[in-house]
Every structure is written in structure tokens, then in C-alpha cells.
Amino acid sequence: VVDAGVPLFCVDMVPTSDTLVWTQVGVDEAEFGRLQAEKLAEVLPENGTVCIAMNQLGTNSQINRTRGFEEKIAELRPDVTIIDEQPADSKTDKAMNLVEDWLQRFGADGINAIVCQSAMTVQGVVEALRAHDLLGKIYVAAQDFTQPSGTEWLETGATYVDVFYDYNALAKGVYDTILD
């Protein structure tokens, strides 16, 4: 890419190479985590507990969404404890397995909220909680879940908050950047 003089545009990712010249089109990933923390801070009980189902380790979204959540929840609710953080890798089945593991380790009463970093993770978390009749009993903070069931889940209490990711605006930003 460098030797050929081909421009590199990164959509929603930040390359780790120091030798590449690139343009990134994306969002403030930490803001996603901060928004989730702000909403959960309003409802978590005193000394509440949270598990985070993260995106793939080392990705811009995983690092910054996690950091944003951790910093904001510590600021707003220092009594809240993040009891576990594990990668779900944006996979529904992996998220379901995480919830099963957390329920075994901490019990249903030991988890007050689960923070999700992608739509597929949300789907797995909700399905696992549904299987244990825990929807609405453990808060779910969602991200990116724009599919029709996402709205239904907010309305029925399966999820408590969903931070919207405007993919149309992202696509327009990429298009405009390439044309510049």
C-alpha cells in the first residue's frame, strides 16, 4: 500500500502500524461506553455489580468502549464494581456462553447489569437471560442493536439502554472522505 501510493481509508478501525499513512472515519468509541455508564448509573443498586461482554480484544472499539464505561461509572458511581470483563468477539453463541458462565460463577443475584459492545453480543446476552427467566431482572446495556427486535427489547425491558450507531452517517463520511 505504501510503496504503491494507494490511499488507505479505515472504517471504524484504527491501524496499529506506524509506517502507514491513513485516514480513519469513525466515531468516538469511548463515548459509547460513557453513555452506557451514565444510564446504568441511574438505576444500579448501591454496590451494584457489572459484567462487560467485550468486542474482540485489541480492537479500537473494545479498548475505547471499555475505557469509556470504566471511567464514567467510576466517576458517577464509585460503589459499582465491574466483576468481570470477557471478550464475546461480537458472536451470539460466545455471548450466550459468557452469560451461562457468569450465572454459574456469580449467581443471578450477583449480577446487576451486563454491558454489551455489539449487536450480536446483545442478542446472545438477551437469549441467555431469557432462557433463565432473567429478562428485566439484570439490566442489559446494548450497542448498535438497530434490528426490529432491538426496539421491542427496549420497550419490554429486555434491554435498558441501546446506544445507536448511525451506519448511514458513517457510510456518508467514508464516501465524502474518499471524494476529498
Predicted regions mapped to residue ranges:
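A residue-level marker of the well-folded mature domains of exported/periplasmic proteins
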Residues: 1-180
